[in-house]
């Protein structure tokens, strides 16, 4: 309703940044629950109290479904496909209750848009609504349609870990944790039954599974046993928060100094690999919000490109790959306001990076077996670690 939209707009204006809008906003007549993804707010209007996580999880599922349907989830894409968006939402929510949230089933009910289908619909006045009931909706495994056939049978799994860390100025870890996911792309004929086992499943805590995973089997044997959905899906997400299990893959050596009364400051940082099991760190970027008193910076990088914005005071350095034999460094001077006292605290350094073929937690897949079908599928597992919120204090 317009009224709810107005109340949400007010909450947006009160928050300094989009990320600071409260996920649950009580108003006189209802609750507004929202998630912020792809620079868009997705808002649910609730008339009576329900567990907020239930609604927030549903909103995330809506966003994932749009991404699956349209390739990207953006304001333009939603406007361009507004009819399909409404058709999908009609199936996902039935009279205010979540109904079909499984991408496989939705695609049988509402065909994803293609250029050809859009042209045909425009000419003939037809819609994307499927002409038959989905076979999976009525079966024991509602996430998988029946009669799936492929000429090439393959199952790929991506283990992706994101590391959040705060490192203090002496290089000690203040906090560190890993958020991990296993994303799957399974294209197998028939009704395959898969089991996936790990070398070291005990290091996973706080695990959440796709509904296809047999939970009892995980509880008793720490093995993932499941009949997979067809196509792309998230098999599980997990958390590793035990400090002793989180290896820190990079270090930053820094010498950033300001002197009282001096109009020059010193700035030196070097980035190097730490516990990377011999894997290359790539896609490295360094950014730092400099104090207000810094007017300009004169820096020389040993590699990559850097930029300092004298208005926003943001320093960005695009480093690229780290070569352990020749560590990347950025050195030089800072021009400060004349006569200004030195800043209260030194800037924080934010890092982004990627490491291919490494799960930083040490998680390793042991084997993948298939039952219930006779053919030999092609199997592949990839690992990747990337930085989430990774901060070094100086």
Feature names for model-found ranges:
Residues 1-153, 160, 166-168, 172, ...:
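Acidic, low-complexity cytosolic segments
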